[in-house]
Amino acid sequence: MEPRDGSPEARSSDSESASASSSGSERDAGPEPDKAPRRLNKRRFPGLRLFGHRKAITKSGLQHLAPPPPTPGAPCSESERQIRSTVDWSESATYGEHIWFETNVSGDFCYVGEQYCVARMLKSVSRRKCAACKIVVHTPCIEQLEKINFRCKPSFRESGSRNVREPTFVRHHWVHRRRQDGKCRHCGKGFQQKFTFHSKEIVAISCSWCKQAYHSKVSCFMLQQIEEPCSLGVHAAVVIPPTWILRARRPQNTLKASKKKKRASFKRKSSKKGPEEGRWRPFIIRPTPSPLMKPLLVFVNPKSGGNQGAKIIQSFLWYLNPRQVFDLSQGGPKEALEMYRKVHNLRILACGGDGTVGWILSTLDQLRLKPPPPVAILPLGTGNDLARTLNWGGGYTDEPVSKILSHVEEGNVVQLDRWDLHAEPNPEAGPEDRDEGATDRLPLDVFNNYFSLGFDAHVTLEFHESREANPEKFNSRFRNKMFYAGTAFSDFLMGSSKDLAKHIRVVCDGMDLTPKIQDLKPQCVVFLNIPRYCAGTMPWGHPGEHHDFEPQRHDDGYLEVIGFTMTSLAALQVGGHGERLTQCREVVLTTSKAIPVQVDGEPCKLAASRIRIALRNQATMVQKAKRRSAAPLHSDQQPVPEQLRIQVSRVSMHDYEALHYDKEQLKEASVPLGTVVVPGDSDLELCRAHIERLQQEPDGAGAKSPTCQKLSPKWCFLDATTASRFYRIDRAQEHLNYVTEIAQDEIYILDPELLGASARPDLPTPTSPLPTSPCSPTPRSLQGDAAPPQGEELIEAAKRNDFCKLQELHRAGGDLMHRDEQSRTLLHHAVSTGSKDVVRYLLDHAPPEILDAVEENGETCLHQAAALGQRTICHYIVEAGASLMKTDQQGDTPRQRAEKAQDTELAAYLENRQHYQMIQREDQETAV
């Protein structure tokens, strides 16, 4: 029987339950080999109450889950260990160790609970969040986790005295949550939370492995579930179970062992094993092969894409085993690939640029893995031509990591040609042709994308040299682009590559192309392996009408040789192509003087040389597949209709950033554009053409759109169905997605340049009474014959700080989103004059888009207020919901503008709120 609430047992449990959680997975990773697990006893799981509600599990009910045997040499308490932010691969690694990173989430209470929290009465105490199990604690409270017996999900098991091949399974890792998305797996109801950021109430119990969640009450969470095997969730096929990873015991150096070592030393000398294969490692991999599994190794380059890499690592640690996620800045991919080389059906995900992919492919070549694991790509940063070729897109936007893992699992395995480059000095070059700044060696001896020489390499080389000399001047993507443009223009005026044809000789498959090149007089010659080049352009084009050339492939063993004049280089950016020279299997290129060259984007000035290009091998890659091909049609599934009639609705960037985790609110904030009719099997590429024609039809549906603002060229589709939130679809991947997979009756698009009030379907009709309150501005379409106030009058009222006049104009139907010639809004002008009353009025009555509206130089009103040191106005704007992560044309955020104005207090405030915004979004993205 359960004790009553007044009993001593219940009271003692009550005091502990606020901080209690269970980790039922501890026992599968190394329990004491000679002790049988104790049977669950109801006396050890009393019915408990926490703030008036029954809780399902408590610390007191988990004492039967003994911790694993201590590791020799390992620290015995949390306080004696350092706070780790990376996975520990040493022999002293702690079982169930958390992976901490700093966080500013003020809404989450310390996980250890009030009884054990040592910092609850302190102010400004730093907090840490575990990337693998998502608990948040004060930094001083980390050592208290041992007192409540809470460890992170285990990432390995002890070998012990058992047979290492003995089959084992993973148990759930249960964690109490005060905030939880989704629905209870038992009752199907949502997790009701009235005050998300201030509630101490534990509402859910969820597993860090499979992400299943239950209400924290005995009617939903059954006690027997604590020891149930865990399925590892929807990504079980790619998750490497902790039961595969064993911590090995260091061999004992006994006298008998040393004699055996000496006796076998001669045999080891003649062994074919390399030094890496023979040395002892603290961890070994003992996989259990299964045809249904595709275990995944994730390699992340944190330097790629600004700060994207570091954030991506945290997301993968949550979805996967932390010991299958590797930071390439911590030593490269070789150790991990060597350790996992015997895992069957292994796949690799490279998170970074094309250079990161090349690094991993070269390492696979060195290790000679048979068969080589296929490599998928999560593109970070810009460029990413190889990722575009394999349908992974030109960069990472905000696609959920869960969807990325599904794409990697379902992707098609394809081949990629890789080419050897062998350069040697040209013996025929004279001393007058030598250049002191030139080198005899290429930056890379293998390329996957392209090898080029001439104009493009010269521009890239100047950029790299300038960045190495003055790195502080190249910390902005906008500045980098401006430098590229300026260098290209000056190089064009100087004509530094106009005589390229006079100094090179090209022989392809024994045929001399030099006369053809001299007639063409190109300023750039490219040897291309993949269709994409220079951030997505297609220089080979589609030679369907030319019988002399075949369409380009990345697995046919042929290179495409292309020449570029200045005219064809300019046409390349608008869909043109270069001058097709030939397709060949081998190239011999001879240069008679120092010429700039680049190998997959790595430039150098190469001295007069003789360069031979030949096929090296083929790498195995993962190509992102069309989604319908990965989902077979079920018998109860509805057939695709011949035609689809779909409502198109547009979403502004401000609404998307604020609401894309709340589908219903974002749908309400969308602006209807009209209706399109497309074939039932249309992909998004075809649908885009129909949508762009929508507003071009004067008498069509687009003319009746509630908004007259046309679509900007940068609009993209939003997936509203396949995830728990909206997310953007890269334009380069539109051909991979069907309309029926991202929309039902309505399709949503994101327009980053949409300004003005969001049109709603519930706008008042022309017969509705006109609003008289300043809180209800009159839409222009509802004013009949009365002419609306001129925008210039509104601007003047804001400039003169004339609050009454502005209010009067607004009541008369003035558009608070009016802009002047410099694209400055009324809020920009109000901030410039420092008028707090006008600022408050605009924030209360103008559409939310005004908060992040930018003027010509890319400044928002918050940038302006921060630069002027207007602390109160900054507070108003931030509290209204303005983005603190927007950058101006100089690449500065509002916080950086405050720092430049030497207002340290304002900068500290903005930094605090910026972190809060980032953590808020991250918490929502990783919520179960």
Swiss-Prot record:
Name of the protein this chain belongs to: Diacylglycerol kinase zeta
Family: Belongs to the eukaryotic diacylglycerol kinase family.
Pathway: Lipid metabolism; glycerolipid metabolism
CDD domains per record: C1_DGKzeta_rpt1, C1_DGKzeta_rpt2
Gene name, Swiss-Prot/TrEMBL: DGKZ
GO molecular function terms noted in the UniProt entry: alkylglycerol kinase activity; ATP binding; ATP-dependent diacylglycerol kinase activity; kinase activity; lipid kinase activity; zinc ion binding
Alphabetical list of InterPro entries matching this protein: Ankyrin_rpt, Ankyrin_rpt-contain_sf, ATP-NAD_kinase_N, C1_DGKzeta_rpt1, C1_DGKzeta_rpt2, DGK, DGKI-like_dom, Diacylglycerol_kin_accessory
Upper classification of the organism: Eukaryota, Metazoa, Chordata, Craniata, Vertebrata
Skewed-composition ranges (Pro residues): 763-777
Chain intervals with Basic and acidic residues compositional bias: 1-14, 25-37
Comment, domains: The PDZ-binding motif mediates interaction with PDZ domain-containing proteins like SNTG1 and SNX27.
